UniProtKB/Swiss-Prot annotation:
Residues that bear Phosphoserine: 465-466, 483, 492, 1335
Residue span(s) of domain VPS9: 1513-1657
GO molecular function: GTPase activator activity; guanyl-nucleotide exchange factor activity; identical protein binding; protein homodimerization activity; protein serine/threonine kinase activator activity; small GTPase binding
Gene3D superfamilies: Dbl homology (DH) domain, Histone H3 K4-specific methyltransferase SET7/9 N-terminal domain, Pleckstrin-homology domain (PH domain)/Phosphotyrosine-binding domain (PTB), Regulator of chromosome condensation 1/beta-lactamase-inhibitor protein II, VPS9 domain
Protein name (Swiss-Prot/TrEMBL): Alsin
MORN-type repeats, residues: 1049-1071, 1072-1094, 1100-1122, 1123-1145, 1151-1173, 1175-1197, 1198-1220, 1221-1244
Amino acid sequence: MDSKKRSSTEAEGSKERGLVHIWQAGSFPITPERLPGWGGKTVLQAALGVKHGVLLTEDGEVYSFGTLPWRSGPVEICPSSPILENALVGQYVITVATGSFHSGAVTDNGVAYMWGENSAGQCAVANQQYVPEPNPVSIADSEASPLLAVRILQLACGEEHTLALSISREIWAWGTGCQLGLITTAFPVTKPQKVEHLAGRVVLQVACGAFHSLALVQCLPSQDLKPVPERCNQCSQLLITMTDKEDHVIISDSHCCPLGVTLTESQAENHASTALSPSTETLDRQEEVFENTLVANDQSVATELNAVSAQITSSDAMSSQQNVMGTTEISSARNIPSYPDTQAVNEYLRKLSDHSVREDSEHGEKPVPSQPLLEEAIPNLHSPPTTSTSALNSLVVSCASAVGVRVAATYEAGALSLKKVMNFYSTTPCETGAQAGSSAIGPEGLKDSREEQVKQESMQGKKSSSLVDIREEETEGGSRRLSLPGLLSQVSPRLLRKAARVKTRTVVLTPTYSGEADALLPSLRTEVWTWGKGKEGQLGHGDVLPRLQPLCVKCLDGKEVIHLEAGGYHSLALTAKSQVYSWGSNTFGQLGHSDFPTTVPRLAKISSENGVWSIAAGRDYSLFLVDTEDFQPGLYYSGRQDPTEGDNLPENHSGSKTPVLLSCSKLGYISRVTAGKDSYLALVDKNIMGYIASLHELATTERRFYSKLSDIKSQILRPLLSLENLGTTTTVQLLQEVASRFSKLCYLIGQHGASLSSFLHGVKEARSLVILKHSSLFLDSYTEYCTSITNFLVMGGFQLLAKPAIDFLNKNQELLQDLSEVNDENTQLMEILNTLFFLPIRRLHNYAKVLLKLATCFEVASPEYQKLQDSSSCYECLALHLGRKRKEAEYTLGFWKTFPGKMTDSLRKPERRLLCESSNRALSLQHAGRFSVNWFILFNDALVHAQFSTHHVFPLATLWAEPLSEEAGGVNGLKITTPEEQFTLISSTPQEKTKWLRAISQAVDQALRGMSDLPPYGSGSSVQRQEPPISRSAKYTFYKDPRLKDATYDGRWLSGKPHGRGVLKWPDGKMYSGMFRNGLEDGYGEYRIPNKAMNKEDHYVGHWKEGKMCGQGVYSYASGEVFEGCFQDNMRHGHGLLRSGKLTSSSPSMFIGQWVMDKKAGYGVFDDITRGEKYMGMWQDDVCQGNGVVVTQFGLYYEGNFHLNKMMGNGVLLSEDDTIYEGEFSDDWTLSGKGTLTMPNGDYIEGYFSGEWGSGIKITGTYFKPSLYESDKDRPKVFRKLGNLAVPADEKWKAVFDECWRQLGCEGPGQGEVWKAWDNIAVALTTSRRQHRDSPEILSRSQTQTLESLEFIPQHVGAFSVEKYDDIRKYLIKACDTPLHPLGRLVETLVAVYRMTYVGVGANRRLLQEAVKEIKSYLKRIFQLVRFLFPELPEEGSTIPLSAPLPTERKSFCTGKSDSRSESPEPGYVVTSSGLLLPVLLPRLYPPLFMLYALDNDREEDIYWECVLRLNKQPDIALLGFLGVQRKFWPATLSILGESKKVLPTTKDACFASAVECLQQISTTFTPSDKLKVIQQTFEEISQSVLASLHEDFLWSMDDLFPVFLYVVLRARIRNLGSEVHLIEDLMDPYLQHGEQGIMFTTLKACYYQIQREKLN
């Protein structure tokens, strides 16, 4: 609260705010007095009951005054001064309310408190007569799970009930009576219940009368509306009926359902069981009689009306009797809703009527102007207008066809005045004197009783025999009661047919929901819902029936009601247009008018000049706060007046039928009025320093401004839009846009006016003014409107309107002058109309002026002063800016009037404005022809070069202007550059050159910034740049360039050429999106080319250079092929992968390898999926040429020569069973020539062979069978030759490594500068990061950190050490982890080609040695790259000396000597390519490599595994004995889970368990070094286990160690131990072989072979 006090109250002191003045109701002359005993606290809100009141102060405290019988102490029952409600101390109360004898308050945390009389449960406490202190009311939503406490926003209290509005905009009720809106017969209701009928709707406010309730509800958005059903959901009867009589047709929407509410589908189940009382029959008879009345002849009118009168009287008597009996159940209630298209039918009937409009000039007052149909349209129609209209048309057509044309003459001869009948039927009796509360004079004492009125009306009805002009009906606002039997009309079918053909222009001027504004400001799209007792018509439904549930008062739809007040037995509704509708009891003139009936809302006649902005309703009087000329609110009183001495008023004149202005201007500025039973109260502010006066001025002028805008909209804009032949489509669209923007602005002003009224009721902090906090809403709306109206002006809209609108304007000239505030009678109509349309812009000056006034009320240093000052400047600045926009539009319009007509049509655009042209500023084209005419016109969006009848338009966004230097010979020259043109303009003088250059530069700058319609908020003038940027974003369509003809480019430009990111689209569907450089595609981009033949498109994503594909990219062909790899000059060049077809297609295949000029050349792998073959070898001109290897899925292996895609020349062929042919080939798998065929058993044939392998081979040669005594060493000599005819490992994938060297800036391996290589790496990383930033794939935090760390180049100064070696190792790990780094890209590619080669068909055991050689080649070539980047790195096999001795020494496992680095031949770290790179490379290549090892060792592994399974069946003791382990090494006891257990003969898998577990880890490691460490750790675990059992130090010998290690290997059960052994052997560093780890590895290898030879006895 401190901040609130510090704000605007500092300017004038809080003691001058919220002063309380109180009057006695009806006492004249008025004697206002200060509230007795009240101190100086500022009161924000007051509420009055019958004999008590409640005050809410600024600091959230609540005081009670008056008679308080519920208080416990006898002294406090009637205190002399207001007393503080101590129970609420500590709570910050935000609102209070009072009923007749109880009170309520709501705290800022949404808790409602009630106290006072509780006889009807109105305080939500059970079985308690009084609630002496404020008691919190527990309100919980039972539908929510778990139960949630409902937070309350507002309370309203009646005599016996209370309503609470929750923060979720739902109504909760408790107390007694039908006014609760709950379906229950058990009263009182002491537990708050939700009013389900309004659940799901947004309720804005609730109000309570004595026994009725009102709710202000926001209209449903149009998308939520459901179509109107044809039939009632309850009784399935038609909602609209048509009755065909002899000479007329009756259309009726008089259908009604029980309970007086229209039940929706969702409520049908809940309420279907409600019983109907016998009185429903009476009402049905009334309806029947009423229909008969409408169709009666003149002679029978009186008889029928008397019958109706009798029915009404009997009905009233019945309901009065029910009230006397005190029954709580309402036996009969009716809801007869208006059909949504009532007004549409009215429209038809208005056109049929030939009668003139009869204006009611009673009391000499000006009649309410007839409002157009659409202004009165109901906002929440349950169906779209088109649907409703079509439904109506179909109904009309059916009517017309039902009766003959001859009926028309009978009908048109005469009919009954529908209006008069409805007037008489609407008059309903007052409530009885008992219920009328304090009314001294009962209904029986009134001279003009209801019965008398019925008789008078029936007599008038007898005289009337003319067709009522339906427009007259509309003139009387609200005379039709839409909730009674409504649309009962007699319609001539002939005229209906005629009317059905009439087409009117549909104009919607109600703005749609505007999101932000609707969230910040009060909504004007509201409905009024009422329920409870209606004996005095206080529900507004046109009858005196009670309603158990809320029912919408349809005739208030579209009236923009913003506030409701409920008196004892009457109701008031305040609209945004400062009008008040009133209905209900008018016994004392409390409605502010004397019109009948009072059962429907009618306009109160308070002040003809001033609008109402606040209202209050007492028991039998009303109060109206009105705007006056000096902005000080005036207070009008209407209602009961206590006769003073000497007054001889008749009994029925105890009230004021006309509101009386109370003279209370001396009090100050009234901010709020509150009414009770016998007294009313006003909260008054003193005008210190003019602050309050300025606030009232702002609010008053805003409300008046809204009324004026509403009048313009309804009386000028809508009629104009409905005119025919308004000109071209563009003009009509522009006018409709003007109307739409005007309507939006008008609605915003209405909302703001309503919010200012609420603002004046509150704390009145300047900083919370919407016009300050959300100024952009207003600034944008005014700017949008100004844009649309100036566009309309430029296109000559007002001139085009002149002809079709002349009649309308002439008839309404006086109205036009009045609205536009033009006093000169000689002003032309079009000028007046122009002035009228620009009228709203003037309001901005008013905002600025009032905000400046408010600012002067504060200290200059205060934030309020600064904010008000800034906002004032903003509004003033916008007003001036929009004024300039208007002048620009008028200047442009004048230019178009003089411009040649043919070119005008193509150049004239709504948003185009003229800046300058060369006819008045001499400018010529350099080197122009002698007789040529060149006219240059500068618009805000283009420079136009006109020549005779032709012209060319240069958009400013892609135009560059620069002055020519004097050296170039152009003293007065301007160089103009556009994407496809470059020309020089010569001005007559240097001054002209400067003017043109400045004009063009500013225009280009404005076009680029899009500021043509944006106001320079917050500054005095627009800050123009000296020159527009050379680099900019723009869109352009090429028209000359052959390559780009008709293509459209949208993106970045630099000096007339595309440069930067952009999108280029060709008319034939081609599109490039990516980077440009100097007008050409350059950098990363995406290219699409449609393939019309295949109805697909080619798609390329990758790098470009100088307009051509160059670098890495992916090309997806329309045929389904995909190429990923390198490009050069739009051709595949370098390393790449081509996928052809899919597995399901006719010829799926895959090639990965080198390309040269779009053809396969060099080494590559081709996988023919259809034939199940894989070729790994050399290519030339797209064919296999040179050495290569082929493997098939059937196990065939060929290596040798290829020529033109065929096996031709020497080669070696192996089959799955190890049959080998080595010799000459002539075709694929075709032997031809000399060779040797070797059988699996070693027998071989030498000679000449011919034929295809697998289909019979002719042999001419010698068969050899080797001697039994020949050595086994010579048998596999052919296997040792494998690989000799394959491509050497170092020749494979050269293109991949060459690409990496190229990325580092080297022409060949090692040929380049190191610093340049590092620069290229940094550029590659930065570029890749930028591309990834724009791509949908977002890098993770760790990836981003890795990239950032890679941008730092490792610096090494001084001697090379282990630490520096470790830095390089860490850098390589990071670099190889990210494909954005050249090394990472290399590794990723190598992994891809390796897998491609050795997976699938390539998983052939014959390829193992090739695979191993390939890895070793990778290591050698990558190591070369690393040594180039880190020149200080020693050569392969060099030793790095240790900088310090190892901190802990251990004994050598093998020798027992103390050794720090027994693996190395000398102390230090040995540098090897495998040691540095295998940890990076091998984990990625491990799966395919290990698979080859497993395939190659398959037979050995099977024998080994069989032995392992067999030997592992034995218990530990038996196995140790069998393997020959010395007894001293047998564990005697074992520690299991900390418990020592003896080793039994049956114990299994327990001995040396830790060593076994350790050795099993060998399968989880990748590199030989890691596997060797596991082996070493296993030996150490064995040693630890033996030491624990021997309790003494010892030295292993191999005889002791081998059996124990053999036991561990067996128990470890490693499935592919042979593969592990061979992998280590092939890839381990040679220097390790003779060290400790080498010996341990040899031991493991020996165990592997030993296990295969073990036999178990």
